[in-house]
Amino acid sequence: MKSVKLKVALIANLIAVVCLVILGVITFMFVKQAIFHEVVKAETNYVKTAKNSMESFKARNSLALESLAKSILKHPVEQLDSQDALMRYVGKDLKNFRDAGRFLAVYIAQPNGELVVSDPDSDAKKVDFGTYGKADNYDARTREYYIEAVKTNKLYVTPSYIDATTNLPCFTYSTPLYKDGKFIGVLAVDVLVTDLQAEFENLPGRTFVFDEENKVFASTDKTLLQQGYDISAIANLAKIKENFEPFEYTRPKDGSERFAVCTKVSGVYTACVGEPIEQIEAPVYKIAFIQTAIVIFTSIISVILLYFIVSKYLSPLAAIQTGLTSFFDFINHK
């Protein structure tokens, strides 16, 4: 009788386990899609946050430069058309503007290539501003910020570069100055990405921003800021993908499979988030593990419960069997 009880319990439990496994597989497939969708949504939001930070950074600096240009151009042309005039009427403004905006340097590149500048060198000399040019083997007319500002006749932002003094990523924002139709020069500010990097350090995810030359200048992961760090794998794919279109790539550094979402920023920069595939899939497999544990636990409990339930309901059969055996023994039909 015990054998019958056990067999009934095992058969019933086997049916229950098969049903649970089928249900678990179907549930896992739907849960996997739902969780992956939520993870992609979260990663996309990280990129959007990084994009907003970069756009705000650029907008602040552009607006500041344009405001200074308007202020300078309020002077009559005779107060702007020579180096002496610029030093006398504008030099102090460059220093005040630099201090207020915490810029690395603020300067006017004149048509002859000479600078009137407020920068760390003038600070070291304990003066508000100074000049820089031919005597220092420097000609502003050969520099990208000057050439592009004059050529486009509008505000120009250089690709990021490493500042020699601070060894930090830096941008130059420049705009041409014209007064009464006369070219005065190019107004420019050097901007460290210190404030932008501080913002990124508080952002979620492994987000970063790079320029057209694939140089990362702000990132939640500081290892990406190292000179020569190769992001070509993700950068090349980002160029052919739509904004916020998820994709996978292989990182050359270690051959690991990774997941990414990228978007263009201001038409010049690219913001991305890049995570290992394992990290993206981890929540999915965690759910699968929990489901497997539940099936195993439920199966064990089912065997025990079914055994006792079957035992209870098969007990009368044992009594009947005993009675019949005694009856046939009595009439000698054993």
Regions found by a protein language model. Name each.
Residues K2-H37, K41, T292-F297:
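Extreme N-terminal signal-anchor transmembrane helix of membrane signaling/transducer proteins, especially
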Residues A9, T27-F57, N61, E78-L86, ...:
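Juxtamembrane interface helices immediately C-terminal to a transmembrane segment
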Residues N13, V17, V209, T270-C272, ...:
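Cytoplasm-proximal transmembrane signaling helix
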Residues K41-K48, F57-K154:
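Extracytoplasmic/periplasmic sensory segments of membrane signal-transduction proteins
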Residues D84-R102, K182, V186-L224:
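Solvent-exposed, extracytoplasmic
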Residues D99, S118-V191, L196-E199, T250-R251:
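Extracytoplasmic/periplasmic ligand-binding sensor regions of membrane-associated signaling proteins
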Residues T142-Y178, P204-F208, E212-E213, I231-G267:
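Membrane-proximal, non-catalytic sensory/regulatory domains of signal-transducing membrane proteins
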Residues Y173, G185-L192, F259-V284:
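Short, hydrophobic beta-strand elements of compact beta-sandwich sensory domains
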